[in-house]
């Protein structure tokens, strides 16, 4: 898994608070247990005009032509509230999002996003409002995230964010739980060679 050190991308300004996991990926799409294929169902109720997903809703921001290919999601407070389904970050990642910016995130959703190699950035409500205004006024322009410096550059303004050092290390180095374990493969092998066979 590639590390996420810096990222520049288009921003989708989803001007809504309390976007819950059922809005992100409705329950009827949760049967699969692999992480791929959920992106087409992302924001199903808002994004499509029909249950079969054949008609896009032209009034939903994700469908606006100027935001196609966006990799950064900007929302209001409490993103990812509701049920703890890990399919929500799966759907966002499968669609192509790498970074989310909001004043706050639901705790489980926040951790699930980090576990799925997405960066949830918390900024103040005032800072998020400034970014909304900039995105609306600067159609087609990208913003830049630097995880090493822990900054978000929007036009000529720099915002600073915080992230737990362990989580930052994992994102920078592309490490998931398996990758972290494999960093200790030699020690694990040495331990296993010393224990009785019936305990292996």
Curated annotation (Swiss-Prot):
Q: Name one GO cellular component term.
A: 3-isopropylmalate dehydratase complex
Record's Pfam families?
A: Aconitase_C
Q: What UniProt keywords are attached to this protein's entry?
A: Amino-acid biosynthesis, Branched-chain amino acid biosynthesis, Leucine biosynthesis, Lyase
**Top-level taxon of origin:** Bacteria
- One annotated GO biological process: L-leucine biosynthetic process
What Enzyme Commission number(s) does the record list for this chain? 4.2.1.33
What chemistry does it catalyse, as a reaction equation?
(2R,3S)-3-isopropylmalate = (2S)-2-isopropylmalate
Q: In which pathway does it act?
A: Amino-acid biosynthesis; L-leucine biosynthesis; L-leucine from 3-methyl-2-oxobutanoate: step 2/4
Listed InterPro entries? 3-IsopropMal_deHydase_ssu, Aconitase/3IPM_dehydase_swvl, AconitaseA/IPMdHydase_ssu_swvl, IPMI_Swivel, LeuD
Q: Which GO terms describe its molecular function?
A: 3-isopropylmalate dehydratase activity
Function according to Swiss-Prot or TrEMBL: Catalyzes the isomerization between 2-isopropylmalate and 3-isopropylmalate, via the formation of 2-isopropylmaleate.
For this chain, the family text in UniProt reads: Belongs to the LeuD family. LeuD type 1 subfamily.
- Subunit-structure text: Heterodimer of LeuC and LeuD.
List the HAMAP family hit by this protein, alphabetically: LeuD_type1 (MF_01031)
Protein name per its UniProtKB record: 3-isopropylmalate dehydratase small subunit
Native species: Actinobacillus pleuropneumoniae serotype 5b (strain L20)
Q: Which gene encodes it?
A: leuD
């Amino acid at each position: 898994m590639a590390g996420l050190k810096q990222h520049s991308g288009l921003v989708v300004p989803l001007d809504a608070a309390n976007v819950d996991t059922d809005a992100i990926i409705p329950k009827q799409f949760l049967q699969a247990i692999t992480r791929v294929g959920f992106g087409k169902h992302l924001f199903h109720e808002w994004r499509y005009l029909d249950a079969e997903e054949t008609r896009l809703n032209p009034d939903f921001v994700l469908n606006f032509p100027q935001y196609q290919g966006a990799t950064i999601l900007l929302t209001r407070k409490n993103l990812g509230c509701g049920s703890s389904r890990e399919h929500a970050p799966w759907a966002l990642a499968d669609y192509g999002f790498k970074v989310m910016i909001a004043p706050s995130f639901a705790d489980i959703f926040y951790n699930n996003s980090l576990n799925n190699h997405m960066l949830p950035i918390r900024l103040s409500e005032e800072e998020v409002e400034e970014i909304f205004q900039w995105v609306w006024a600067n159609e087609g322009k990208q913003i830049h995230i630097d995880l090493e410096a822990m900054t978000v550059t929007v036009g000529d303004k720099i915002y600073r964010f915080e992230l737990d050092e362990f989580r930052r290390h994992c994102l920078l180095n592309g490490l998931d739980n398996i990758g972290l374990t494999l960093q200790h493969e030699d020690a694990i092998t040495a331990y296993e060679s010393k224990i009785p066979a019936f305990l292996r």
